[in-house]
């Protein structure tokens, strides 16, 4: 459609049976892969080295940040933000912000990584106590 930009070395696969559609105003950065039968919504921005597997739908005004990957047959809701290097393995709700691999809601992802040092210390303490018994 109109006002679409596709950066260098990016690939938009042609569909065999359905349609691959990049809607009005979408921006596809360099080295992005859009597989067959995908739909990219109006105003979506796909950043460098992102990849979308076959038959997935990216909604309107979605940000798919660098090196993020979307598995096949998934739906990324309107206005969602997929952080860099995220591996999307399930549908993403409209307006959601996800990160990690596999993807988590950004709030859960932050809690998970904030607790990682504590978990490490708990494991060390457990091993110390186990060695004493």
Please give the residue ranges for each predicted region:
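Long, leucine- and charge-enriched amphipathic alpha-helices
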Residues: 103-133
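Structural signal for interior beta-strand "rungs" in well-ordered beta-sheet cores
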Residues: 1-105
């Amino acid at each position: 459609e109109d006002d679409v930009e596709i950066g260098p070395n990016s690939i938009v696969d042609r569909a065999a049976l359905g349609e691959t559609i990049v809607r009005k105003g979408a921006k596809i950065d360099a080295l992005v892969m859009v597989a067959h039968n995908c739909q990219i919504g109006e105003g979506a921005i796909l950043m460098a080295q992102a990849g979308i597997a076959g038959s997935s739908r990216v909604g309107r005004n979605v940000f798919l940040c660098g090196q993020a990957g979307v598995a096949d047959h998934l739906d990324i809701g309107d206005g969602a933000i997929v952080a860099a290097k995220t591996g999307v393995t399930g549908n993403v709700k409209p307006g959601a912000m996800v990160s990690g691999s596999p993807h988590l809601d950004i709030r859960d992802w932050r809690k998970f990584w904030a607790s990682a040092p504590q978990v490490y210390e708990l494991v060390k303490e457990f091993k110390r106590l186990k060695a004493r018994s």
